[in-house]
């Protein structure tokens, strides 16, 4: 078996491709179930954000598993496989492990060191467990990646002062307008990204902010976090009226369909000189045809790269420090992974010794007769079990801890031969991975 990741990111695909492959949380159960139905995929975890979509798998046969996974991605996105392949990356075992560690630490993000990705990795792990996608291997991998992400943020300064997608969008708006306090702002959406938009807009001097959301209650919950700010709250029913009065529009919702297009915006902007729209959603909330309107200047997440680049250079040295920590985490995971090949031998040895213990205990108790107290039987049961555990403990620990692959395999072969165990198939199977 092998660990693999197949996916795309802001580095390999533009937003119009990424949005077609987006797998939001509300459809992950369906996607996970479909992937688990393929014969060569044992475990599955789907990480889907505005800047990446990656599927982590444990495959019985690597080539067959990759083929099944890429075919699924083509069908899901409705992009022909030949066209999709140019945007996909495929990483196997140690490379896949290191990739998830880097993602979790924020080293593969558009915004180097950003903190949101760690929460997204945690959510991926949680849902992969909930929907029976992750098994023992991906569970261990994601736990270690989450731990690595926390460690990098604790032991380095990579997360200090890091810009986010939201702050980069606000920075771009300030560059384009110079004075945010003189402009009326509308934010469509009331989730985490919108909360960050409000935070950064207020810090840059914006003071005329309206929040539009399907649920007014959710908008109120967002406003409660900014008690001193005069935020205007509206439902989407008021969208046309609010946008008519807005100079800057930010969109950040989980909608899979565009909320704004040319037909909606044309009557809104017909009597003004310009309107700027900053769409930080994937899939995009703003249709590309709005650019046909001369008054509209629309920006999406891919347009933020220039802003982010200004923040990156000072963080590269911190990233190098983080990489060395991640190498330790990868090595730790690899030791655990390699120890898995000892499981069939250890399991067979324990089963055989336990069977002998039970047989000999039964003989001894039958000789002692029925008058032998039950309490005494429990004592003898515990005694024999303790002896077995003590005898097996050191050999099992030493076998698992042996990092020299050939030495470990020779030890397993010796145990199989000496105790006449039936774990040879398991050893052979691990040798082929």
UniProtKB/Swiss-Prot annotation:
Key words of the record: Chlorophyll biosynthesis, NADP, Oxidoreductase, Porphyrin biosynthesis
Classification via CDD domains: NAD_bind_Glutamyl_tRNA_reduct
Active site annotation, chain numbering: 50 (nucleophile)
Site residues, Important for activity: 99
Protein family: Belongs to the glutamyl-tRNA reductase family.
Domains as described in the record: Possesses an unusual extended V-shaped dimeric structure with each monomer consisting of three distinct domains arranged along a curved 'spinal' alpha-helix. The N-terminal catalytic domain specifically recognizes the glutamate moiety of the substrate. The second domain is the NADPH-binding domain, and the third C-terminal domain is responsible for dimerization.
Protein name, UniProt field: Glutamyl-tRNA reductase
Organism of origin: Acaryochloris marina (strain MBIC 11017)
Lineage of origin: Bacteria, Bacillati, Cyanobacteriota, Cyanophyceae, Acaryochloridales
UniProt gene name: hemA
């Amino acid at each position: 078996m092998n660990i693999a990741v197949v996916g795309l990111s802001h580095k390999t695909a533009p937003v119009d491709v990424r949005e077609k492959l987006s797998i939001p949380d509300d459809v992950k159960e369906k996607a996970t179930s479909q992937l688990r139905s393929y014969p060569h995929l044992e475990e599955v975890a789907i990480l889907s954000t505005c800047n990446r979509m990656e599927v982590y798998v444990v495959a019985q046969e690597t080539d067959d598993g990759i083929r099944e996974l890429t075919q699924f991605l083509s069908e899901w996105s409705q992009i022909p496989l030949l066209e999709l392949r140019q945007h996909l990356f495929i990483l196997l075992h140690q490379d896949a492990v290191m990739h998830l560690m880097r993602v979790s630490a924020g080293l593969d993000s558009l915004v180097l060191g950003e903190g949101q990705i760690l929460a997204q990795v945690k959510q991926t792990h949680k849902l992969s467990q909930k929907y029976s996608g992750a098994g023992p291997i991906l569970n261990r991998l994601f736990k270690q990646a989450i731990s690595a992400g926390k460690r990098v943020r604790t032991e380095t300064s990579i997360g200090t002062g890091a810009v986010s997608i939201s702050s980069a969008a606000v920075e771009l708006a300030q560059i384009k307008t110079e004075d945010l306090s003189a402009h009326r702002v509308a934010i469509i959406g009331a989730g985490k990204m919108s909360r960050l938009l409000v935070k950064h807009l207020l810090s840059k001097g914006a003071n005329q902010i309206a929040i539009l959301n399907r649920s007014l209650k959710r908008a109120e919950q967002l406003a409660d976090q900014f008690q001193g700010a005069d935020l205007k709250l509206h439902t989407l029913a008021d969208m046309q009226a609010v946008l008519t009065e807005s100079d800057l529009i930010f969109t950040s919702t989980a909608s899979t369909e565009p909320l704004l297009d040319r037909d909606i915006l044309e009557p809104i902007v017909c009597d003004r000189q310009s309107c700027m729209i900053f769409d930080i959603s994937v899939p995009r909330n703003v249709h590309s045809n709005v650019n046909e309107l001369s008054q509209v200047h629309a920006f999406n997440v891919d347009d933020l790269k220039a802003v982010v680049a200004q923040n990156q250079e000072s963080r590269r040295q911190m990233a190098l420090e983080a990489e060395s920590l991640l190498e330790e985490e990868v090595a730790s995971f690899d030791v655990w992974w390699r120890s898995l090949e000892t499981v069939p031998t250890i399991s067979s040895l324990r089963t055989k010794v336990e069977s002998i213990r039970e047989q000999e205990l039964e003989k001894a108790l039958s000789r002692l007769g029925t008058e032998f107290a039950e309490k005494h039987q429990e004592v003898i049961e515990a005694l024999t079990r303790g002896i077995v555990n003590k005898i097996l403990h050191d050999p099992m620990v030493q076998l698992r801890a042996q990092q020299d692959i050939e030495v470990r395999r020779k030890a397993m072969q010796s145990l199989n031969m000496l105790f006449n165990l039936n774990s040879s198939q398991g050893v052979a199977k691990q040798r082929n991975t």
